[in-house]
């Protein structure tokens, strides 16, 4: 999805307590941003925030982090957090490659990857969020019981991700090849997912863990 640049977005994001600043040492201290010490779940690439804000509202016993690098859409997540009065959701405006700057080893319980950019050209494979470089980061910050939830409408990215995770030493606890046909009612739609599922697009989903987190 191409994001339209909004020159005012950067100023808008300044001085909001819901936004984790990009300065200083955060690894191991992320719980200090929340009112309560609770398990931490992250969504990488939150878009406009429908998925993560819905989760946070439904699960006040979990602390959520929305990680989105595009300032021009982060403000939409911020507005939702403020409007809904969510105290268990904070926002990081940065790239996923910087994950270990924010989280120490074993600090996270779950990672969500929803409709990530497929980067279809082979020369761009290293940018895919299921490339081995990113998997190594996830393994580092997830605790021993932690898992990864992945959802996409792109069959090629799904097949690539299954292979990439298997080669990295992960195993799958759930695989859905047509999520909306198999859904038990627990699925939370993203904005993107709603748009394309209404057009009949098949949605693929998996849950995976590392054989050895450390």
UniProtKB/Swiss-Prot annotation:
Single GO cellular component term: tRNA methyltransferase complex
Asked if the keyword NAD belongs to this entry, the reply reads no
Q: Which GO terms describe its molecular function?
A: tRNA (guanine(46)-N7)-methyltransferase activity
Positions of substrate binding: 121, 153, 190-193
State the family named in the UniProt similarity comment for this chain. Belongs to the class I-like SAM-binding methyltransferase superfamily. TrmB family.
What is this protein's function per UniProt? Catalyzes the formation of N(7)-methylguanine at position 46 (m7G46) in tRNA.
This chain belongs to which protein, by name?
A: tRNA (guanine-N(7)-)-methyltransferase
Gene that specifies this protein: trmB
